[in-house]
Amino acid sequence: PRTKDFEMNPATADPTELDVSDLDLWRDGPPHEVFRMLRSQDLHFSELSDFPDEGGFWSVVNYEDIAAVGRDHETFSSKRSIILVDRLPAEPGAPDPIDISQNMMISQDPPRHDRLKALVQRAFTPKMAVEHTERMREIINLVYDRALEKHPDGRVDLVQDVGYFVPAMVIGEMLGAPREDAAQLVDWTNRTTAFEDPRMVTDLDDVWKAVEEFMPYVNDMVTERETNPTDDLTSAIVHAEVDGERLTHEEVLMFFFLLMVAGNDSTRSVFTSGMKSLMD
């Protein structure tokens, strides 16, 4: 009921009555009117969580506060992980989600976070982007050609036909994954990160199935590069040292997963949402 009130009139709603974890709020896409209202209030608000074991959480909605939180890792640590654990499907004997995520860079605080970030930061500088320009142009042309073959009238779906594939093929190639695996990588990352979206996942058991399929794929790539390094980003991570030590095999696996999700899902969302905003 609280969410319905916000949908009807977010401009006059009380921010303390909003539960941003209520899936109904997101049913028709991001609730931009609600976001604007929250930013105009210039405050933090406490979510009315339906998950008592989690105790609710704070939403930070304006730039100044977000910047302050980002600079203060002692007060706002990332070690607890970034997920609402109770929202994940549970299976007997399944690994603890927090334990898994704590092998990822985004669940680390400085100074280790900064050292892990430095391992890959050089691969995403403007200079490196220029060096990849021709390969990215080749990928974009390939994706557009395929989209036009699928839609001879020239009316393509920007998300399904373009946004799904360009970021996945670019980051996949940087990591050393074959281009032909792009669709499978998109499917795995969708199912493991969008487990509450009924358009992506209809059966929660399918989330764990995706993990069981994805991890052996990554494990094979990492194992191969441990003995036969190439010039891709996965090899660089495998053979890098942080604090004088190599990353563990599990840390490398989760690094690959993180980069694949960030380079695929996050980039796709920014690209397609940005295009929609420009068109609107």
For the regions a language model picked out, list residue spans one by one:
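Cytochrome P450
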Residues: 2-280
